Curated annotation (Swiss-Prot):
It comes from the Bacteria. InterPro entries: Thymidate_synth/dCMP_Mease (IPR045097), Thymidate_synth/dCMP_Mease_dom (IPR023451), Thymidate_synth/dCMP_Mease_sf (IPR036926), Thymidylate_synthase (IPR000398), Thymidylate_synthase_AS (IPR020940). Keywords: Cytoplasm, Methyltransferase, Nucleotide biosynthesis, Transferase. It catalyses: dUMP + (6R)-5,10-methylene-5,6,7,8-tetrahydrofolate = 7,8-dihydrofolate + dTMP. This is Thymidylate synthase. Catalyzes the reductive methylation of 2'-deoxyuridine-5'-monophosphate (dUMP) to 2'-deoxythymidine-5'-monophosphate (dTMP) while utilizing 5,10-methylenetetrahydrofolate (mTHF) as the methyl donor and reductant in the reaction, yielding dihydrofolate (DHF) as a by-product. This enzymatic reaction provides an intracellular de novo source of dTMP, an essential precursor for DNA biosynthesis. Pathway: Pyrimidine metabolism; dTTP biosynthesis. DUMP binds at residues 21, 126-127, 166-169, 177, 207-209. GO terms for biological process: dTMP biosynthetic process; dTTP biosynthetic process; methylation. One of its GO terms (cellular component) is cytosol. It comes from Cytophaga hutchinsonii (strain ATCC 33406 / DSM 1761 / CIP 103989 / NBRC 15051 / NCIMB 9469 / D465).
Length: 264
């Protein structure tokens, strides 16, 4: 995916050195955007192998409103282990905000249900938005949302999605985020009777950790391979009815995985 390689090269060429919360240090740029046409293949990196199973399970976990890692652990997904407490809880993170945003009068807002209904009934709305950035609950979260806010857009029978990501771990996190939101866009499009359009990824602080620079250069040296296709069970009509078995990745032939440490 040239868009992603261009981002990494831009950071290596133009980035500034910054300190960060984890103490690792980064090379960073501010404000960057990528666009992926979902009709041209599923945007899963081919220049290193990614674990699509983890991405899919995490997205299904978000959509169920879950904030305990038990479901992930039961499915051999460990990407949230470093942040969970001794009981597996993460506080009111993504799934809670997506499905149960608390209101001052003690009620809760299911943003996912609301946005799907709005897409179906008022597709030209400019309010097709879901936010995970709840200022009043940031301190309760084990990790504040990195991918904080997304908006849908309907035109010509296609559903597009733009994500704003405040903090972007470009080597490890961003490839997961691209695939996750591309899949979410396809799922929402299906249940709304639309085709998938574009996924637009807007980054705030886009950074390579200082211990990922050599891995990034190795990845940049690799040739692109054809993008895979993601097949979704067409019988699923509700965004909350999807199961892991409803997704089939076809034609994925990536270069080998590149190991890199997670900054916690």
């Amino acid at each position: 995916m040239k868009q992603y390689h261009d981002l990494m090269q831009h950071i290596l060429d133009q980035g500034v050195k910054k300190e960060d919360r984890t103490g690792t240090g980064t090379v960073s740029v501010f404000g960057y955007q990528m666009r992926f046409n979902l009709q041209e293949g599923f945007p899963l990196l081919t220049t290193k192998k990614l674990h699509m199973r983890s991405i899919t399970h995490e997205l299904l976990w978000f959509l169920q409103g879950d904030t305990n890692i038990k479901y992930l652990k039961d499915n051999n997904v460990s990407i949230w282990d470093e942040w969970a407490d001794e009981n597996g809880n993460l506080g009111p993170v993504y799934g809670y905000q997506w499905r149960s945003w608390p209101t001052p009068d003690g009620k809760h807002i299911d943003q996912i249900t609301n946005v799907v209904n709005m897409i179906k009934n008022n597709p030209d709305s400019r309010r097709l938005i879901v936010s995970a950035w709840n200022v009043g609950e940031i301190e309760k979260m084990k990790l504040p949302p990195c991918h904080a806010f997304f908006q849908f857009y309907v035109a010509d029978g296609k559903l597009s999605c733009q994500l704003y990501q405040r903090s972007a771990d470009v080597f490890l996190g961003v490839p997961f985020n691209i695939a996750s939101y591309a899949l979410l866009t396809m799922m929402v499009a299906q249940v709304c009777g639309l085709q998938a359009g574009d996924f637009v990824h807007t980054l705030g602080d886009a950074h390579l950790y200082s211990n990922h620079l050599e891995q990034a250069k190795l990845q940049l040296s690799r040739d692109f391979r054809p993008l895979p296709a993601m097949k979704i069970n067409p019988d699923v009509k509700s965004i909350f009815d999807f199961k892991f078995e409803d997704f089939t990745l076809e034609g994925y032939d990536p270069h080998p995985h590149i190991k890199a440490a997670v900054a916690v």
